[in-house]
């Protein structure tokens, strides 16, 4: 058993199984993404029950789960990158649970934190490269077609640089020492920007 503050991990030496449990979704100390926990303060009130192997468990609501996937990808993007598997997790979650998601709430929550454009670029990558079916999505302003949304030019949707970064990153951005070093500078810049924005307010 390993206790790392906001994360606890169990590691079995005989099987190699590792189970991590986080006591918060994001580190409260992080200036870059600690504020994202605010969106999950009502997580227990909004939790849903699912049944796995005849056992009921509580989990995030479908909107909060998808928002968490977006935030988690951004967290890894800031700390070195994330792989195509994480984009597949995002698109597969939508394909599986999209009909249960309150899309208006989803987009509103993302827009409040300026993550809506990032999510739209993940959708574009999913459509272009992963055979993603977006028929369960209602886009912002009740738009039902991705092409219509992109042509409206209300959002910066140009996923070419992002997909190149994803493919270069490896699983979690640790493909090279240069990436790890650059990630530290990026995270530092984001934290400084958050600090200066708070000082202006």
List PLM regions with ranges:
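Conserved NTP-donor binding/palm subdomain of two-metal-ion nucleotidyltransferases/polymerases, i.e.
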Residues: 1-201
């Amino acid at each position: 058993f390993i206790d790392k503050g906001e994360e606890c991990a169990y590691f079995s030496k005989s099987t190699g199984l590792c189970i991590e449990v986080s006591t918060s979704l994001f580190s409260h100390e992080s200036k870059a993404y600690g504020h994202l926990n605010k969106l999950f303060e009502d997580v227990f009130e909004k939790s849903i029950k699912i049944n796995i192997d005849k056992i009921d468990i509580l989990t995030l609501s479908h909107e909060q789960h998808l928002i968490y996937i977006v935030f988690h990808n951004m967290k890894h993007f800031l700390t070195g990158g994330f792989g195509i598997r994480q984009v597949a997790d995002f698109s597969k979650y939508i394909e599986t649970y999209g009909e249960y998601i309150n899309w208006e709430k989803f987009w509103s929550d993302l827009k409040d934190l300026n993550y809506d454009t990032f999510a739209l670029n993940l959708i574009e990558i999913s459509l272009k490269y992963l055979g993603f079916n977006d028929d369960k999505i209602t886009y912002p302003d009740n738009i039902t077609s991705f092409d219509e949304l992109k042509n409206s030019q209300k959002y910066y949707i140009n996923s070419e640089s992002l997909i190149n970064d994803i493919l270069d990153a490896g699983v979690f951005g640790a493909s090279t020492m240069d990436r790890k070093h650059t990630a530290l500078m990026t995270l530092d810049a984001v934290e400084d920007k958050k600090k200066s924005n708070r000082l202006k307010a």
